[in-house]
């Protein structure tokens, strides 16, 4: 949630080469108009980028499913990750540094560090089973 009226949903795509990735957004299978930022080259010569979709908080909190779809022709990679508002939030994230898209509903990602407006505590379960706990206040989270 970016502010009291707008939510920003994020999709971080990293570890792809060459620099050519397609990202699309859907709300309950209907195309949405998201933004894909310019890719940055990483130290290992692969690339990463961020795509985001802004939606009214009223729509985000109704429980509709939003999906970030990613395809990379160079590696034949195709994947999607769906997100839905979760009050009080326990969420699942890929392991940081992995090659899969990273999202963290109901928040935005900046290096997979959740930044929230309303929640005060957040439990994160990584795909490898690891657990992280965050204490969130004033739109920022710190690991407990």
UniProtKB/Swiss-Prot annotation:
PANTHER family: TAPASIN. One of its GO terms (cellular component) is extracellular region. Signal peptide: none annotated. The keyword Translocase does not apply. Glycans are attached at residues 3, 43, 123. Disulfide bonds join 11-68. This is IgW chain C region, secreted form 1/3. Keywords: Adaptive immunity, Disulfide bond, Glycoprotein, Immunity, Immunoglobulin, Secreted. It is found in: Secreted. Residues 87-144 are annotated as: Secretory tail. The lineage of its organism: Eukaryota, Metazoa, Chordata, Craniata, Vertebrata. It comes from Heterodontus francisci (Horn shark).
